[in-house]
């Protein structure tokens, strides 16, 4: 079960139980994920669970009847559900809550139904019920249908199956039998009600002597055994899908009638088998049922040969009723098993794999009865032949030819090109899916390998390569599952190797991943220096004013000027301007299932005020079949990491530019040195923070994780392992870079915002000082109109220049300006320190409680000398002191004052 399936089921369960508030779905999801254990079904555990529920139930007979009915329909996951219900019977508190909840829901439903009835004078539900819904309702209520209604039900079933199959095979509709096949009852081979032998010359059997009665009854039985009414034994009309019953002349001798009643079940079973063969021979029921019906028809022919031989004996006067009973014994067992199988298939509405599951289970259950097991093995082997033919095409060639929707793997129409466009497209997961109800029970353990084998070969085929499995052999059903399991495993190993070699060697998957790492994870240092220098001015503009073609040209120039020019895949790198900033994107992704962040998706959009820096991201063009691994989801993760690191690099460049521009301020070394020192110190703290964060992400997160990925890719045995390793690499990078934790992400974004605002403030102040200095320089350096100043003029102008410099310095050190600037710097220092302490405190909590040991490295880097740890301890002590209640001083006799020795004078 995938993570999102667990999210969906937990949310649906909370909704059904009407649980609001509390711990929220996330707590229960986490518990389920940590405590999942596979349920292994055994006969003993299933039986004990069934007995426990039956003992607990008020109507155990109804429960056992329903259980047997579901079991006969081969319902999936029935035993795990029964086991869960048996566990619930032991938990009294949970059971009481569920009973109370069910009672409240029933009352709410009743009140809603009452309100609807009073609101409308004419009920409209009945008028909207279609014929199909009416038939389904009758089936659920177990109402008895007449023969004509049964025929309509069969026609409706065939129509439903035909519509489903034609919808899947839109290009090639399935053939159908002409209508007269179903309209002419004489073609069915079963009893025709009311068409028995002529009764004009029938003598009352009670008037005949005993020997004549026996002879007449034997003749009637020979007719009845082949589906024709006799003179004294006639078939009754069918009531629904019940077994055939017969009416025996009541005047028949009692001893003869008793023996006749023992033989008649053979005729009833023959009628059931004949109807099953004729019904399942229709195209709509699939090849497995066709093969089963054909195998049954072969056995029925042998049965008819036996009846013919008995008729020959009767004509010779050598067949008595006792001999008939003796000769029919072997056939009775065979026909009874065939009828039982036919009834089970009909009741379970089995098609394809579900039919094979039923036959396999029945063969396994007849382990002690060799003849019955041999019969079931014959039927199962015959019925499985078309299924194994589909299976062989799938695991040996990667082709599905399943016109009747019988195979365990279902194909969906998805375009592989959409992997590049649609984030939610799941080509690899949804192009081919497993249908649990169509998995034969003897292939349950290898269903995943069967799915993967065909998928691997199908990918290679779609790339234009012919695939021929060298280990291909015919698969034949046997109770020894190891025979065809080994064949499936050989095909799986071959398909895995073919696709893996194709992607790794011919399509150069690892080289593409290295190219993506070079650009998205900033592995190419000189390229980014060139690129950010070239695009700095353009990226400062709002998104609406940026010319994308200009950015593409600058990207091309930076690629050609750096060592990235040797990258063979550099032309696949593109530029994309995202519609929202990184924080909004990440919070939306993280808010899929959490109630706390759901409100953020409805907040006022900030996309209109985005700058190029906030919207900038790289994109990468990936072609099929590499897009199976480097799909849109993976590229989105790469983009998140890149935008995070790119913005950190931008903040670092801004702080470095502040350091360069601050050299001008060092000329004014009077009073300004006192309050400029605070700004310089804060800038260095910010720069130290940003650089350490970058170093941590690049060299302590991405590089080790990348080396693990490369090692895992070398040892991967199939493409699913490659996909899992790549996804794990990206998930670990996102987690360790603090991009999956909303709380850490918010604090980090606040720190980045403080750094950017500080650099903007310092740049404005430095620019103002530069303008004043430039104006003073022009005032000091201007000469006479006649030419440059002479030596005498320089000596005379020296006092004036010193006076001007003093005036500029005093202007910079003006008390009003100094106090305002100092307050601004103190405010920045206060905000930065508060957010950084908050980040360190949260990192400390997560590194200990969630076992995120990698985050401890960030703490040691940012707080290498314990400076922030002391401040955190001080803040914690102050908070605990404020939160501590004031303890009143108990009143009592005052303690004597301590004596202090006073030294002698």
Curated annotation (Swiss-Prot):
Keywords: Cytoplasm, Cytoskeleton, Microtubule, Phosphoprotein
GO BP terms: brain development; microtubule nucleation; neuron migration
Biased composition (Pro residues): 887-896
Pfam families for this protein: GCP_C_terminal (PF04130), GCP_N_terminal (PF17681)
Compartment list: Cytoplasm, Cytoskeleton, Microtubule organizing center, Centrosome
InterPro entries linked: GCP, GCP_C, GCP_C_sf, GCP_N
Modified sites of kind Phosphotyrosine: 83
GO MF annotation, one: gamma-tubulin binding
Chain positions covered by the region annotation Disordered: 877-905
GO cellular component, one term: microtubule
Subunit structure: Component of the gamma-tubulin ring complex (gTuRC) consisting of TUBGCP2, TUBGCP3, TUBGCP4, TUBGCP5 and TUBGCP6 and gamma-tubulin TUBG1 or TUBG2. TUBGCP2, TUBGCP3, TUBGCP4, TUBGCP5 and TUBGCP6 assemble in a 5:5:2:1:1 stoichiometry; each is associated with a gamma-tubulin, thereby arranging 14 gamma-tubulins in a helical manner. Gamma-tubulin at the first position is blocked by TUBGCP3 at the last position, allowing 13 protafilaments to grow into a microtubule.
Entry function: Component of the gamma-tubulin ring complex (gTuRC) which mediates microtubule nucleation. The gTuRC regulates the minus-end nucleation of alpha-beta tubulin heterodimers that grow into microtubule protafilaments, a critical step in centrosome duplication and spindle formation. Plays a role in neuronal migration.
Family per similarity comment: Belongs to the TUBGCP family.
Protein name in the entry: Gamma-tubulin complex component 2
Source organism of the structure: Mus musculus (Mouse)
Lineage: Eukaryota, Metazoa, Chordata, Craniata, Vertebrata
Gene label: Tubgcp2
């Amino acid at each position: 079960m995938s993570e999102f399936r667990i999210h969906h089921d937990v949310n649906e369960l909370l909704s059904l139980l009407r649980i609001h508030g509390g711990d929220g779905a996330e707590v229960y999801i986490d518990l389920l994920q940590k405590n999942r254990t596979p349920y292994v079904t055994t006969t003993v555990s299933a039986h004990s669970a069934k007995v426990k529920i039956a003992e607990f139930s008020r109507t155990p007979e109804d429960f056992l009847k329903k259980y047997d009915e579901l079991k006969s329909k081969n319902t999936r996951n029935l035993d795990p559900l029964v086991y869960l219900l048996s566990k619930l019977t032991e938990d009294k508190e949970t059971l009481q809550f569920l009973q109370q909840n069910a009672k409240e829901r029933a009352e709410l439903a009743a009140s809603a139904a009452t309100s609807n009835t009073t609101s409308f004078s004419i009920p409209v539900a009945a008028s909207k019920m279609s014929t199909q819904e009416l038939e389904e309702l009758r089936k659920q209520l177990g109402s008895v249908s007449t023969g004509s209604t049964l025929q309509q039900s069969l026609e409706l079933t065939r129509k439903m199956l035909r519509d489903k199959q034609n919808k899947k095979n839109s290009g090639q509709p399935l053939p159908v039998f002409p209508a007269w096949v179903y309209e002419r009852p004489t073609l069915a081979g079963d009893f025709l009600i009311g068409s028995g032998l002529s009764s004009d010359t029938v003598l009352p059997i009670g008037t005949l002597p005993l020997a004549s009665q026996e002879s007449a009854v034997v003749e009637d039985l020979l007719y009845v055994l082949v589906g024709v009414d006799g003179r004294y034994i006639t078939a009754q009309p069918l009531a629904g899908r019940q077994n055939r019953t017969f009416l025996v002349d009541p005047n028949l001798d009692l001893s003869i009638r008793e023996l006749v009643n023992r033989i008649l079940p053979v005729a009833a079973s023959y009628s059931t088998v004949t109807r099953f063969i004729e019904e399942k021979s229709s195209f709509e029921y699939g090849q497995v049922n066709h093969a089963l019906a054909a195998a049954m028809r072969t056995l029925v022919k042998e049965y008819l040969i036996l009846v013919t031989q008995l008729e020959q004996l009767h004509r010779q006067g050598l067949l008595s009723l006792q001999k008939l009973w003796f000769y029919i014994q072997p056939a009775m067992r065979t026909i009874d098993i065939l009828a039982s199988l036919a009834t089970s298939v009909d009741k379970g509405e089995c098609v394809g794999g579900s039919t094979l599951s039923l036959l396999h289970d029945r063969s396994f259950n007849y382990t002690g009865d060799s003849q019955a097991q041999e019969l079931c093995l014959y039927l199962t082997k015959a019925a499985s032949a078309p299924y194994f033919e589909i299976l062989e095409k799938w695991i040996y060639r990667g082709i599905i030819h399943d016109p009747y929707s019988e195979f365990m793997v279902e194909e969906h129409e998805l375009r592989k090109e959409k992997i590049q466009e649609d984030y939610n497209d799941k080509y690899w997961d949804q192009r081919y899916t497993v249908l649990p109800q169509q998995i034969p029970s003897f292939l349950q353990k290898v269903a995943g390998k069967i799915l993967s084998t065909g998928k691997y070969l199908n990918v290679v085929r779609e790339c234009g390569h012919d695939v021929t499995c060298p280990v291909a052999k015919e698969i034949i059903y046997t109770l020894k599952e190891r025979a065809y399991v080994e064949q499936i495993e050989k095909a799986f190993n071959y398909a895995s190797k073919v696709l893996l070699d194709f992607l790794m060697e011919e399509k150069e998957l690892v080289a593409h991943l290295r190219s993506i790492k070079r650009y998205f994870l900033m592995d190419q240092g000189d390229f980014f220096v060139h690129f950010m220098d070239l695009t700095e001015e353009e990226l400062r503009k709002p998104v609406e004013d940026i010319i994308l073609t200009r950015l593409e040209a600058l990207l091309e120039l930076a690629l050609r000027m750096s060592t990235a020019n040797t990258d063979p895949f550099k032309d696949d790198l593109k530029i994309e301007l995202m519609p929202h900033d990184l924080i909004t994107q990440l919070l939306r992704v993280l808010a899929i299932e959490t109630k706390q962040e759901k409100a953020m998706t409805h907040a006022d959009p900030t996309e209109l005020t985005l700058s190029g820096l906030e919207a900038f991201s790289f994109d990468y063009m990936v072609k099929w079949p590499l897009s199976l691994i480097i799909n849109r989801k993976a590229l989105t993760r790469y983009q998140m990491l890149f935008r995070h690191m790119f913005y950190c690099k931008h903040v670092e460049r801004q702080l470095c530019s502040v350091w360069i521009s601050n050299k001008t301020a060092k000329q004014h070394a009077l009073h300004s040195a006192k309050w400029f020192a605070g700004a310089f110190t804060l800038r260095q703290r910010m720069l130290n923070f940003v650089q350490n964060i970058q170093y941590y992400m690049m060299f302590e997160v991405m590089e080790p994780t990348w080396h693990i990925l490369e090692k895992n890719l070398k040892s991967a045995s199939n493409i699913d392992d490659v996909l899992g390793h790549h996804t794990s690499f990206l998930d670990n990078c996102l987690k360790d870079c603090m991009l999956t934790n909303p709380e850490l992400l918010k604090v980090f974004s606040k720190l980045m915002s403080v750094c950017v605002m500080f650099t903007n403030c310092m740049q404005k102040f430095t620019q103002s000082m530069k303008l004043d200095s430039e104006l003073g320089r022009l005032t000091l350096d201007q000469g006479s109109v006649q030419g440059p100043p002479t030596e005498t003029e320089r000596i005379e102008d020296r006092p004036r220049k010193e006076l001007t410099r003093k005036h500029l310095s005093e202007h910079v050190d003006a008390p009003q300006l100094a106090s305002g600037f100092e307050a601004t710097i103190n405010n920045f220092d206060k905000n930065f320190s508060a957010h950084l302490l908050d980040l360190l405190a949260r990192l400390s909590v997560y590194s200990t409680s969630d076992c995120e040991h990698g985050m401890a490295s960030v703490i040691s880097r940012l707080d290498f000398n314990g400076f922030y740890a002391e401040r955190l301890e001080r803040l914690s002590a102050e908070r605990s002191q404020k939160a501590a209640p004031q303890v009143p001083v108990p009143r009592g006799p005052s303690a004597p004052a301590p004596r202090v020795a006073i030294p002698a004078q």
